[in-house]
Structures are given as C-alpha cells and as structure tokens.
C-alpha cells in the first residue's frame, strides 16, 4: 500500500486533473436513491474530492478520508471540508453511516486485506445501509503503473463476498479511457 500512497502523493495534481470532472452521476444517483434524505456518508478514499463535493452540494453530511496526505490537502481545498488522512485498515467506527462511498478506492488493497476492510465498513454502517464500491473489470491482482490493484469480475466477486445488492458494468468515464471497464457494486448491511 505504501507504493500506492507514494504514487498518489507524487502524482496528486495529475490524478485530480484526470478524475475531478469525470461524470459519475449515474453511480452517484443509484447510491443516493438508497439513502435517507439527511444521510451521513463516508467517502472512503475520496481522491480528488469530486464525489464528496457532489454529496455536500446535495445536502448530505459527508466525512471524507484518503490515505494520501497530498490528496487530503487538495481535496480539502476543493470541497471546503477537512479530509482525514487514514488508511482503510484504520476505520474503527460503529453504526455511524447511512452509506459508504468507496469509488475506485479499496481496489488498491490486496485481496487478503480486502475482506477485513469490508467487514470494518459494515460495522461502521447503520443497519440496512449500503456501500458503493467499484473495481477495474478483470481478474488481475498486482502492481500496475506504480499502484497496487485488485480487480474483479462478477463471478470472482460473488465468490469473494455473498452480500451483493446490485452490480453493473460501465466504461471508464475519463477522457480517452472509454475502453476500460469497471465493475460497480452496491452491498447492503442487513439488520441482524
């Protein structure tokens, strides 16, 4: 994970330029439709702050985190809120959020670290709340372009976790990246 964080610290401005204006409206709205009107959202690995800003402008309460100090600084400036620097593994809240938005973020965890983090995410959710997450659409796991990636396809993710609420595949919305595919998922925490 340190290699990935170093990548984002060194390339934060270029990353923001390539992602801040990406049109995530369809995924954002699918996610928001599942939340109460005054929902509290954790933007877990907020990157540029694009989605945090969108949710704030829609009137939601948002807590934003990222593992990269430089992305936290720049996203905080963009969104107007403090972005907490933390690793995914450091999430330690209980029943706080109505939704967790982990857009193209937890895919940077090795598969063996991913399930414990998803379990922590579920603990941080209120009952019957949802997680949105997305992964590059393939079966690759390892370092690519200076960052670690765990990719999934529908069948491999279903084998990995059994609580999928909804899934869909989209093309990359960044300019020049339309040939790249993404697996989008909504997971629901069920009341026990």
Task: Put a short name on every predicted segment.
Residues 98:
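Conserved acidic residues
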Residues 101-102:
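A conserved beta-strand element that flanks and buttresses the S-adenosyl-L-methionine
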Residues 1-95, 112-116, 120, 130-192:
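Class I (Rossmann-like) S-adenosyl-L-methionine-dependent methyltransferase catalytic domain
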Residues 105:
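Hydrophobic adenine-recognition pocket in adenosine-nucleotide-binding enzymes
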Residues 110, 125-126:
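Helix-to-beta-strand junctions that scaffold the AdoMet/dcAdoMet cofactor pocket
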């Amino acid at each position: 994970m340190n290699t990935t964080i170093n990548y984002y610290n060194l390339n934060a401005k270029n990353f923001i330029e390539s992602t801040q204006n990406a049109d995530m409206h369809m995924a954002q709205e699918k996610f928001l439709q599942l939340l109460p009107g005054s929902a509290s959202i954790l933007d877990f690995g907020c990157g540029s702050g694009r989605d945090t800003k969108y949710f704030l402008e829609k009137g939601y309460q948002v807590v934003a985190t990222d593992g990269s100090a430089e992305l936290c600084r720049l996203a905080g400036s963009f969104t107007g809120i403090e972005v907490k620097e933390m690793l995914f593994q450091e999430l330690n809240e209980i029943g706080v959020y109505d939704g967790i938005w982990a857009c193209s973020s937890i895919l940077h965890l090795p598969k063996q670290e991913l399930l414990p983090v998803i379990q922590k995410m579920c603990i941080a959710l209120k009952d019957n709340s949802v997680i949105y997450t997305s992964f590059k659409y393939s079966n690759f796991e390892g370092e690519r372009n200076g960052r670690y990636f765990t990719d999934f396809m529908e069948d491999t993710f279903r084998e990995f976790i059994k609580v999928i609420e909804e899934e869909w595949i989209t093309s990359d919305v960044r300019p020049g990246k339309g040939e790249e595919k993404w697996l989008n998922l909504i997971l629901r925490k069920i009341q026990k």
